[in-house]
Every structure is written in C-alpha cells, then in structure tokens.
C-alpha cells in the first residue's frame, strides 16, 4: 500500500519498495555559501525556501525523521518557521558527509541505523528513490553505502563533466565514478559515431545511504588522490576498499540547480 501523496514510480531495476520494517533517517545538508549560486538554500520556490521544499518532499518517503543539518542560523530559522527540524553544525566541514557525521552524533543514532543523504537543492526528488536507497542498503551487508543511477539517454550529457557517470560490477556495486565519459566507447568514437554505447552509460544520482556508524567514520578516512582530481567525495570510499551498492532508477533525475537559469526553470514547476 502506498503512503498518501507518495510516488512509487522508482521501484525500477528490480529493487523493491522499502520494507516497512526498515527504519531510516533523512539528513539534508544545507549551507548558504554555495559557490555557483550563493544563498540557493533559501531561494524562493512558490513561496517557500528551497530547503523547506526539499524537506517536505523527503517527508513523503518512508523516513522516520527528516532533519536539515546546517551551519547557518538563517537556514535554521527558515526551517523552524515552517515546521522543519534543523540542527546547527560547525562551519568548517569540508564536505556534506562530514557535516552529516556531526549530525549523527548530535542525534545519538546507533551505528546500525540507516541514514539517507538528500542534497539541499533537490526540491523535485522522488520520494520512492529515497526509499529505494534505504532499502537497498538494508539488503546489502557487503556494502557500507548505497546510491543511485539512471541510464543516460542524451549524448551531450555523456560528455558533460557536470554529469557524473558510474560503472558497476555484475552484482550492482560501483567500480568507479567519473566526470569523464564512462565507459569510453572506443570503437564508436574511433569511427566518428556521435551516439551512446549499448548498454547505455549510467548517470550518477547524488543521493547516498549509509549506516550511521560508517558515516561517523567517513571523516577519519584520508582524502584520496582520485577524489581530489575528480572532486567526487564518494571516490574516497572506493579508494579505501569499501563498497557502494547502486540502485538503478527507472526515473530520470530532476534538474540540477547550479545557475540562475536552472533556478528559474525549477520555479516554473512551483508556479
């Protein structure tokens, strides 16, 4: 049975909806100092701040709690004004995962508890995708994290460094993430074919499930050279020999919000 208002479109690729027995918390990292679009967490979307829209969307999932983790009193106050729980964290965290590690400690989460990290600029995220990431991690004792991907259908996105690609092994674990075209279609490019290889490359979707114990351990893992080169913090996990399970989503991810033009496109959705 579906929760009222919740979308179950994202049961794709054989991953069942989250087991009601799987309890998980959604954490949303949010800060004002966005480099490409400053203050976007508080950008108005149909009368509500973006971060509040994200939290409301997350609340349609099966999460037992949705909490915003921020270093901004403005963001905390905006959340409180709309009934969204928010925690204040330190301002010196280098990544969103580091911020969420502090939030796990503040919340007193058990090491086995599942946490899903939803980015603070995803106001159109599918609630079913959140459930799928939590459910997949609960099923995969061989993995410390879960994430998601969607089959690319646009050749321009294949070559776009802002669209992160992922390749997986035979049992759905990430082998590598890259901003480069991945996998590289040698024969197609050698013959000048401007098309996508078959099977289609996978576009990474920036949602992550973790055990709270691993999330607390993440900041102690040394940064990897590949992480610095690609500017992708999930590569730190693979570098240290850990595994990430990948849910194949049937639903195309919502648009990213990195420029004023992106923001205007999303605003049209909210009228």
From Swiss-Prot:
Pathway where it operates: Nucleotide-sugar biosynthesis; CMP-3-deoxy-D-manno-octulosonate biosynthesis; CMP-3-deoxy-D-manno-octulosonate from 3-deoxy-D-manno-octulosonate and CTP: step 1/1; Bacterial outer membrane biogenesis; lipopolysaccharide biosynthesis
Catalyses which reaction?
Answer: 3-deoxy-alpha-D-manno-oct-2-ulosonate + CTP = CMP-3-deoxy-beta-D-manno-octulosonate + diphosphate
Family indicated by similarity? Belongs to the KdsB family.
Entry protein name: 3-deoxy-manno-octulosonate cytidylyltransferase
Q: Which major enzyme category is it?
A: transferase
Where does this protein have coiled-coil stretches?
A: none
Q: Which domain of life is it from?
A: Bacteria
Q: What is its EC number?
A: 2.7.7.38
Gene Ontology cellular-component terms listed:
cytosol
The record, for Pfam families, names:
CTP_transf_3 (PF02348)
GO MF term list = 3-deoxy-manno-octulosonate cytidylyltransferase activity
| Gene Ontology process terms (BP) | CMP-keto-3-deoxy-D-manno-octulosonic acid biosynthetic process; lipopolysaccharide biosynthetic process
CDD domains xref list = CMP-KDO-Synthetase
Task: Specify the species.
Answer: Leptothrix cholodnii (strain ATCC 51168 / LMG 8142 / SP-6) (Leptothrix discophora (strain SP-6))
* Disulfide cysteine pairs (residue numbers): none
**Which keywords annotate this record?**
Cytoplasm, Lipopolysaccharide biosynthesis, Nucleotidyltransferase, Transferase
Its annotated function is as follows: Activates KDO (a required 8-carbon sugar) for incorporation into bacterial lipopolysaccharide in Gram-negative bacteria.
Q: State the compartments where it is located.
A: Cytoplasm
Concerning SUPFAM superfamilies, the annotation shows:
Nucleotide-diphospho-sugar transferases (SSF53448)
């Amino acid at each position: 049975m579906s929760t009222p208002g919740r979308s179950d479109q994202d049961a794709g690729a054989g991953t069942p909806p989250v087991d009601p027995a799987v309890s998980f918390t959604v954490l949303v990292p949010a800060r004002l100092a966005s480099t490409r679009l400053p203050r976007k967490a508080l950008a108005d979307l149909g009368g509500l701040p973006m971060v509040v829209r994200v939290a409301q969307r997350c609340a349609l999932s099966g999460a037992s709690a949705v909490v915003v983790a921020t270093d901004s009193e403005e963001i905390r106050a905006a959340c409180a004004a709309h009934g969204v729980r928010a925690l204040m964290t330190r301002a010196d965290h280098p990544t969103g995962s580091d911020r969420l590690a502090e939030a796990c400690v503040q919340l007193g989460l058990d090491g086995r508890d599942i946490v899903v990290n939803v980015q603070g600029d995803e106001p159109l995220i599918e609630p079913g995708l959140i459930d799928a990431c939590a459910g997949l991690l609960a099923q995969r004792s061989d993995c410390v994290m879960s994430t998601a991907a969607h089959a690319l259908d646009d050749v321009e996105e294949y070559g776009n460094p802002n669209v992160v690609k992922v390749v997986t092994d035979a049992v759905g674990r990430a082998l590598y993430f890259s901003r480069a075209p991945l996998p590289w279609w040698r024969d197609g490019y050698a013959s000048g074919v401007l098309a996508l290889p078959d099977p289609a490359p996978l576009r990474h979707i920036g949602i992550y499930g973790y055990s709270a114990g691993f999330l607390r351990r993440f900041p102690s893992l040394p940064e990897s050279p590949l992480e610095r080169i690609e500017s992708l913090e999930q590569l730190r996990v693979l570098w240290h020999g850990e595994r990430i399970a990948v849910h194949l989503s049937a639903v195309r991810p919502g648009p990213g919000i990195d420029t004023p033009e992106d923001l205007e496109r999303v605003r049209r959705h909210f009228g």
